[in-house]
Amino acid sequence: MRLVVTGGGTGGHLFPGIAVACGMRDRLPGTTILFIGTSRQVDRIGLEGLGFRQAVIRSSGLKGMGTFARLRALAQLPLAVFQAARILGRFRPDLVLGVGGYVTGPVLLAAKLRGTQVCIHEQNSVPGLANRLAGRIADRIFISLPCGPSFPGARTRLTGNPVRGEILAAADRRRPRPSDRPPTLLVLGGSQGAHMVNSLVVAAVERMVADGGRLRVIHQTGRRDLDMVRRAYAKLELQAETADFFRDMASVYLQADLVVSRAGATTLAELAVMGLPVLLIPYPHAADNHQERNGRWYAEGGGAVLLQESLLNGNILAEEITTLLYNDQNLQVMGSRMRTLARPEATERIIDQCLELVQTRGR
């Protein structure tokens, strides 16, 4: 089996692809896998040490760009398709799986022109532009949420969002917090950070400490705000672990009691598997407002509380955190409901569908 996974640029796109690639290699140990992605740091760090082949093509996104940037992206498209075709010609894949992000478009188009079977996975409740276009040519379309996007029914499968194996394994090791340990708040702004989330949480924690609250904080800040957040917590003499990007999310999740996060689909899938309750602050400028729609599904299921960034300040967020963080029963109920929304079998479902496609083609 020779598999190409294409996508990336954010952890939300990359990590489901990694989950499927690792699962395929476990299922068929002789599988050779190539990732075609971006040159961004998250792709490089995320794939580090996994033993997959890697390639990068030059491509740019269209959505949310100005006129000049769009024209430049369109001008790059023929070259990107040519680069992708050359890479695919050398690798000769049996199947190409697109996991979202602008880099997928040229690769999937080149694959289809070569007669290679193509699948896509959509993590969000609203598909990105690349997947909306790719859905027209894909042989199989995998969606993550029951409230997910409308694609051609005969080719669409509800699979859930693949979660990396080390996080699935960690979910079985999660235990209640020891009574002598202060509760731990985990703060996630996505793989690239979120300035407003960082600022709001710092203000909220300052208020909580001033009111005598005991807590520990683990905070993924992104590169931009790392120093600011570290200085704020040091001034409070708070027990805190901060990083621009955590590589071992499984161990981070195991330490958390409550999460404050954006509403990216892959983060939500991981939190659901772990059974972690979450206060969600959706990114208000996300394409087609997909983060709010992602978060609403988990909030309606009882595992999350959905907050609007425009209505928040440090005091309000402190009250929301305090209501949950110091009430073990509330945390337990929300965590249990969050776990019922998980689809830990998503990776295996996608692999089954991919292998069925390849086997059908080989008959």
Predicted regions and their residues:
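Donor-nucleotide binding loops and adjacent catalytic segments primarily
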Residues: I36, Q41-V42, G46, L50, ...
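Active-site-proximal region of nucleotide-activated glycan assembly enzymes
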Residues: T31, R53, K112-D172
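An amphipathic, basic-hydrophobic alpha-helix
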Residues: G66-L95
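A short, well-ordered alpha-helix in the C-terminal region of glycosyltransferases
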Residues: N330-P344
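Short hydrophobic beta-strand element within catalytic cores of glycosyltransferases
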Residues: S261, P277-D288
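C-terminal alpha-helical cap of glycosyltransferases
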Residues: R343-R363
